[in-house]
Amino acid sequence: MNDIFTFAGLIDHSHDFIIGFHAVLTALIALFLAKMATRSLQVVPGALQNVFEALLDGILMMARDVIGEEKARKYLPLTGTIAILVFFSNAIGIIPGFESPTSSLNYTLTLALIVFVYYNFEGIRTHGFIKYFAHFAGPVKALAPLLFPIEIISHCSRVISLSFRLFGNIKGDDMFLLVMLMLAPWIAPLPAFVILTFMAFLQAFIFMILTYVFLAGAVLAEEEAGH
């Protein structure tokens, strides 16, 4: 979004500064709300605790089908943090005067690299270095020289697909909102705000569930190879 539409643009006209400012801001908002929700846990939850419990229960419910109950809970701190952070990073750009950190390819690429490094680390830690990379070659040894480089390229391309999918969608949403605010009064874009909020949630969900899918492929690699 053009600098004139961001409060941070009044302080510094560097786009990197604006993205960094909003990245820190969204992280602080997410951390503050999480602290508030868990500050005094109750049997009968308050509104904020109820929202976070519903969110985490929803993540676990969907993740069970992907990776199983035990591992879904094991990786919940990572995936839950990613889901919440990505949602706030997407949604903050809907507010006039703010810009989505996820509208920057550098930011989404950083998130994708974190996921890429982590799921490969977990795969190596679970199966060992040799066994983990051996499954890239497939069950047929004769095809290993062909399949191994293809699998390596396929895994590396996940960084590109994860980062560009999120970046492209949120950048497009920001451009759409910018045009709406330039052409229509403040009240007219209200339906667009609702749609963009849903899109912010949807993109956070997709990023989160793909993280679980990649983790499942890494830590369950030996089981998949056996079928």
Swiss-Prot record:
Subcellular locations according to the entry: Cell inner membrane
Residues passing through the membrane, by range: 17-37, 78-98, 104-124, 176-196, 200-220
Superkingdom: Bacteria
Keywords from the named record: ATP synthesis, Cell inner membrane, Cell membrane, CF(0), Hydrogen ion transport, Ion transport, Membrane, Transmembrane, Transmembrane helix, Transport
Cellular-component GO terms for this entry: plasma membrane; proton-transporting ATP synthase complex
Pfam families, alphabetized: ATP-synt_A
Family assignment from sequence similarity: Belongs to the ATPase A chain family.
Protein purpose: Key component of the proton channel; it plays a direct role in the translocation of protons across the membrane.
UniProt-recorded name of the protein: ATP synthase subunit a
Organism: Wolinella succinogenes (strain ATCC 29543 / DSM 1740 / CCUG 13145 / JCM 31913 / LMG 7466 / NCTC 11488 / FDC 602W)
